[in-house]
Amino acid sequence: MPLDDRKKRILFAVVTDYIMTAEPIGSRTIAKKYNMGISSATIRNEMADLEEMGYLEQPHTSAGRIPSDKGYRFYVDTILQNFMKEDLSPPPRVREEVIAEFDEIVKKYAKILADITHHTTVAKMPKLNPDKIKRLQLIPVASNKMIMVVITDTGIVKNYLLNLCQSVDRNVFEFLNNLLNDKIAGKSEKAIFNFLEKELKDTLGDMAFMADELIKTILLSLKQLQETDVYTDGTLHILDFPEYKDLNKAKNFLSLLDNKSLLNEVLEPVDDFVDVKIGRENRFEEMRELSVIKTTYKINDRVVGTIGIIGPTRMDYRRLISELTLMTRELSNLLSSIYNDEV
């Protein structure tokens, strides 16, 4: 049964008040604070109907009511409908110096978002598959140390310090450096690993044994490109919420943030402008008392990662959606400006 306008206004008021106070709300509170133009008795009857319809819940013996996941969903959907119509300008406070390392830029924005919202933020770094490598270069820093610089087709730069037990002959090193760029750039993932694991030794011939350790180290580093990194910030903000004063509940939340494979799935990119999962809408049991607001960040309209906010279902969705959207838009603009020439 669809909600009429009066029920919608009452439900919106209940959710808004509960987000601010964390206390169950009664009909008299709604009548006094929100100028509904109807009696508290009428509001009480409407709230009883909303409870029967699954939008509100009555905790323990309290006379007041709190929103259910379904009630929060109505609230969020209403916000998102209005939000799409708003003209948002990026916040000037986050435009700072350019940082060369891609991951550090994303981490910095996740930290700023956590500081602004006082919530835990999570960011998914892009999975940089080897078939997206534009250039690979080895830079010697010592006889047994070198930096491997990987540049993707989007211009993202990844640096790896390679520590070797044995030094590599300079002639072998230069030959290998040129060979890698010639054979790897623009090739498919399968072709890259096939070359490194099988063909390279034949190509090197007598020099293969001198470069064996280096080749294995390069292979290991390239395989790390296939692993998605998840970064978290503001983890202790959860302790500021009354819902997490219970020590065991707080420990469970912190354990959840250590589960990178779960967070990796939670942060899978979505087609929606902003995706909000509330309580039991989350498919993981560990997330059933939490809400996740997430959106993607891009380089020149190409999705490269996801950034989100995790917290209790009682969160200020309107403010958090706004802050997340503004921050992600600014992050995308910065990344696009840095890597524009490389795409």
UniProtKB/Swiss-Prot annotation:
Keywords: Repressor, Stress response, Transcription, Transcription regulation. The keyword Repressor applies. One of its GO terms (biological process) is negative regulation of DNA-templated transcription. InterPro entries: GAF-like_dom_sf, HrcA, HrcA_C, WH-like_DNA-bd_sf, WH_DNA-bd_sf, WHTH_transcript_rep_HrcA_IDD. One of its GO terms (molecular function) is DNA binding. Negative regulator of class I heat shock genes (grpE-dnaK-dnaJ and groELS operons). Prevents heat-shock induction of these operons. Belongs to the HrcA family. This is Heat-inducible transcription repressor HrcA. It comes from Caldanaerobacter subterraneus subsp. tengcongensis (strain DSM 15242 / JCM 11007 / NBRC 100824 / MB4). The lineage of its organism: Bacteria, Bacillati, Bacillota, Clostridia, Thermoanaerobacterales.
